[in-house]
Amino acid sequence: MTGKAKPKKHTAKELQAKADAALTNRGGGKAGLADRTGKEKGGHAKYECPHCKITVPDLKTMQIHHESKHPKLTYEEPRNLHEALAAPAESSKPKPGIRGSLKK
């Protein structure tokens, strides 16, 4: 009589790939850029903690973060990053489109 076939468990390569995908910061690419930084969807990077530079979407979350991470410091309302970044200063020198120097 033959035995019942055992299903194969995950291979070491699969487990390593899964751990690598979970633990490596891959960036978001262009797909999530508007959601991470843009105004049109609200964006997730609206406010920045002045002490640890973490970004949060709203003032209530900032207050919760401040109470838990910086309890000994006084809470002051942070500035909105979108308003601060809305009008970047114009530089007099144009930037190259490709890495390297400007063509003369």
Curated annotation (Swiss-Prot):
Q: Which UniProt keywords apply?
A: Cytoplasm, Nucleus, Stress response
* Disruption of the gene: reported phenotype: Plants lacking both MBS1 and MBS2 exhibit premature leaf senescence.
Which InterPro entries is this protein grouped with? MBS1/2-like (IPR045230)
Report the induction information: Accumulates during senescence.
**Which cellular compartments is it found in?**
Nucleus; Cytoplasm; Cytoplasm, Stress granule
Listed Basic residues bias regions? 1-11
Question: Superkingdom of the source?
Answer: Eukaryota
GO MF term list: DNA-binding transcription factor activity
Per the annotation, which location comes first and is thus the protein's main one? nucleus
What is one term from the GO cellular component aspect held by the record? cytoplasm
- Is Nucleus included in the keywords of this UniProt record? yes
**SUPFAM superfamilies this protein is in?**
Expressed protein At2g23090/F21P24.15 (SSF118359)
Segments for region (Disordered): 1-46, 64-104
Q: Where is the composition biased (Basic and acidic residues)?
A: 36-46, 73-82
* GO process annotations (BP): cellular response to singlet oxygen; leaf senescence; regulation of DNA-templated transcription; regulation of leaf senescence; response to photooxidative stress
* UniProt function note: Required for acclimation to reactive oxygen species (ROS) responses downstream of beta-cyclocitral, including singlet oxygen 1O(2) detoxification reactions, especially upon light-mediated photooxidative stress, and leading to programmed cell death. Prevents leaf senescence.
Protein's name according to its UniProt entry:
Protein METHYLENE BLUE SENSITIVITY 2
- Per the UniProt record, the source organism is Arabidopsis thaliana
